[in-house]
Structure formats: C-alpha cells, structure tokens
Amino acid sequence: YGLKDFIYSYPTNLSGGMKQRVALIRTLATKPDLLLLDEPFSALDSQTRIIICNDVYKIVRKEKKAVVLVTHSIEEAIIFADKVIVLSNRPSKIKNIYDIKLEKNSNINERRESLEYTKYFNSIWKDLDLDE
C-alpha cells in the first residue's frame, strides 16, 4: 500500500492517508470476526481508495467477516454493503433501509457499473434531501 519506504518513519511524518492505511492494515491483521469501520477510506486519494476498498471488500467476502461501515459516501455504502441504513439529520433516526442486491462475486468496479447501482444511488440521494 505504498508504505514500504516509510517503515522507520514516525507516525508524525506520515500523511493522513498513510495513517489511515496503517490503521486498516493493523485492524485486518488481528483477523477480527467483526470489523467496525468509521470512514475508513476518507483520507485516501481516489485511486488508492478504489484499490484499498476493493482489497478490503475481497478480504471481507473471502473470510466472511461482518462489517459495520460508517460513511458519508453513498458510493462506498452501495458497493461495499449488503444493507445500507440512511439516517436523518440530528437527532438521527432511521430514514430508510436498503437491502443491496448486487452481484456478490463481482469486484467494486463491476458493482458500480451495474444498472442497479445507479437506482440505489438515486434513491439514497433522494432520501438525503440534499437537492432542497
């Protein structure tokens, strides 16, 4: 994940994205049954986000891990999750629940390119009331 050259660096010398990659690696290395991921890809650049998100997605599927993913990214929620829960503004309440039915054996790019992905994205966008 581009960290090899920084093996002897202090954490203060790492970028936010590097620290986030270290945190993800450390979490996955412990092989937990449940992953609690709070904005795990937010500090990553677009290309790195896609690569690491795809890697984590494959690991989670292969090892049958349960994941609770907190994200502000509709895209991440749809391509990564089996279920998306949309919350209202404060005080947070469940606004809608989506059972995501995309091909589980596909990679995240294939999931993103499906027609169903676009339908989910548009529905979730409407739930967020951001157009008003």
Feature annotation, model-predicted:
Residues 1-6, 58:
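Conserved ABC ATPase "signature" region
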Residues 9-12, 30:
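Conserved signature/switch motifs of ABC ATPase nucleotide-binding domains
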Residues 24:
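Hydrophobic anchor residue at the start of the ABC signature
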Residues 35-38:
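Catalytic Walker B motif of ABC-type/P-loop ATPase nucleotide-binding domains
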Residues 49-63:
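Helical segment within the ABC ATPase nucleotide-binding domain
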Residues 64-70:
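Conserved H-loop
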Residues 79-86:
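Conserved catalytic segment of ABC-fold P-loop ATPases
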